[in-house]
Amino acid sequence: MPNSWVDVDKALDYLARSDTLPHRAEGEGVLVRDLAGCLPGRVLDLGCGDGRLTALVLAAYPESTAICIDMSPAMLDAVTERFADDDRVTIATHDLEDPLPFDGPFNRPFNAVISSLAIHHVDDERKRTLYAEIVALLTPGGVFANLEIVRSPTQALHDRWRDEMGARDDPSDRLAPMEPQLGWLRDAGLHDVDCIWKWRALALLRGTKPRPGPSM
């Protein structure tokens, strides 16, 4: 089934609404501050959209560099325009349904892997394999931080979330509950896994790749 985010009209409609999503900026602020222990350094933004989150991270940690990946032509046009004069940013086309690359600009570890409102578009099996790939790309001590839509515990809470968002359900959504996702992050090898901020179905999930312990 083709990925619906290649549809230019759908992507442009999302971009027109995305800056007004309730409490998004609050969650982004918590995410940016959570990276203080691992940046400046190399950042990978998964499903970067128009580059909004990368721009916030680079504003806070200006000595960092970033690779932004997305598969939507409209999103790639928007992020390319945003960073046209910023040589700290590399932009690449990649579908999160496919395994993350480990060659070219991806052949060195990242200090942080970030994502916002993207990973919920892949199914649960792919989420789990993606988390393992993220851990493999992180340097020891690196952080994965994901500001994500999670499945609400009840339909009533889900309906209220959608009402406050002013949006309908998207057939491309593959929402998973928060608690299993925290477990998948631990299973992938991350430590200090937690949900460190949440507003209704919008949750900030994070974990740190452990550093090697002392040799015996």
Model segments located where?
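Class I SAM-dependent methyltransferase SAM/SAH-binding core
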Residues: 44, 50-99
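A short His-aromatic
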Residues: 120-122
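A short glycine-rich, Lys/Arg-flanked "PGG" loop and its adjoining helix->strand segment in the class I
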Residues: 128-140
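Conserved class I S-adenosyl-L-methionine
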Residues: 1-38
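Short conserved loop adjoining the S-adenosyl-L-methionine
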Residues: 98-107
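C-terminal alpha-helical "lid/dimerization" subdomain adjacent to the S-adenosyl-L-methionine
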Residues: 145-188, 192-195
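Core SAM-dependent methyltransferase catalytic element
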Residues: 194-216
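A conserved beta-strand element that flanks and buttresses the S-adenosyl-L-methionine
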Residues: 114
